[in-house]
Amino acid sequence: MAEDSDADKSEEPTAHKLEKAREKGQIPRSRELTSMLMLGAGLAILWVSGESMARQLAAMIAQGLHFDHGLISDDKQMLRQIGMLLRQTLIGLIPIFAGLVIVAMAVPMLLGGVLFSGESIKFDLKRMSPIAGLKRMFSSQALAELLKAILKATLVGWVTGIFLWHNWPDMMRLMAAPPVAALGDALHLIIFCGLVVVLGLTPMVGFDVFFQITSHIKKLRMTKQEIRDEFKDQEGDPHVKGRIRQQQRAMARRRMMADVHKADVIVTNPTHYAVALQYNETKMSAPKVLAKGAGAVALRIRELGAEHRIPLLEAPPLARALFRHSEVGQHIPATLYAAVAEVLAWVYQLKRWKREGGLIPKKPEHLPVPEGLDFATEESETD
């Protein structure tokens, strides 16, 4: 049954499912990436401050090996000397430890982002189940981790062995060099060896990152029924409903604005409302509303109209009536046919004047808007 259930999970996880998994601490992690970048950070710190650390180490070794009769006879003085050497050692190592801690905390953010979840550290009896433990031991994930560990050990051993083989004479010469020079040269060899190891691990780490991400997505896959159930659950969420309605309004507004350039005329009020009308006598039974809006939306409609050189007519009663009693994409109400007919007649006269010249057509006034359709109270509305 479990196999059938897994086989049915053919759909990619939704954003909601991914977010829920994240809240539970389930995000892709690559230990190999963390290890490699920590090694790289350590090498970078050694490269920057290694020489000064080598000099401090040489001085500490010389001081520690210096024979002093006073220290042998004075236990307190000896303890103070040992404490001072330990303090100097810790101070010298602070840059390395601090850098490694910062990298160890920052690297996981590359894959899963910043996450502080208490779910991952909660006590769970299922994790202590011997059967579940055996399943994890013999799972494909465990097999992949085993093969990865073997490959990593083999690769690191092979790269390190080749490096030692090629640099063996230089390593032998360190034995005859002065202590400070020998420490500096040894440090350079260590940095170079680590760099070679990092470069050798890079392809494997890249594969591991890809594997961890795909495994995480595969583990969260859903069945079609789970997606339907999730959608139904989210439909009841008022926040989700509000977000969906907001997105729908934004999409409708974008579509509406995209049609403004097709309008024959824009009727305005002149600051509160704007309605874009289109009429094609061969294809339409009545004029159609392409766009309408109040406030900022009305202003944008007027701006688009000006950009496309669409005639604008200030007719407050008609603009209010069209805004309140018509819908975008629908024909205007029959009660407004007469008023809109006068507007369209003016538009046609305006087009003829632009082609042929002559007297400028007079804008229509006192349009016949029936009582009850014109709401004289001008409100600043937003669509």
UniProtKB/Swiss-Prot annotation:
Keyword Transmembrane helix: yes
InterPro entries: FlhB (IPR006136), T3SS_substrate_exporter (IPR006135), T3SS_substrate_exporter_C (IPR029025)
Protein name, UniProt field: Flagellar biosynthetic protein FlhB
Pfam families: Bac_export_2 (PF01312)
Residue ranges, annotated region (Disordered): 1-27
Composition-biased stretches (Basic and acidic residues): 7-27
Membrane-spanning intervals of the chain: 33-53, 91-111, 146-166, 187-207
Role of this protein: Required for formation of the rod structure in the basal body of the flagellar apparatus. Together with FliI and FliH, may constitute the export apparatus of flagellin.
Iron-sulfur listed as a keyword: no
Family that this chain belongs to: Belongs to the type III secretion exporter family.
Membrane topology annotation: Multi-pass membrane protein
The entry's keywords: Bacterial flagellum biogenesis, Bacterial flagellum protein export, Cell inner membrane, Cell membrane, Membrane, Protein transport, Transmembrane, Transmembrane helix, Transport
GO BP of this protein: bacterial-type flagellum assembly; protein secretion
Cysteine disulfide links: none
GO cellular component: plasma membrane
Cell compartment(s), UniProt: Cell inner membrane
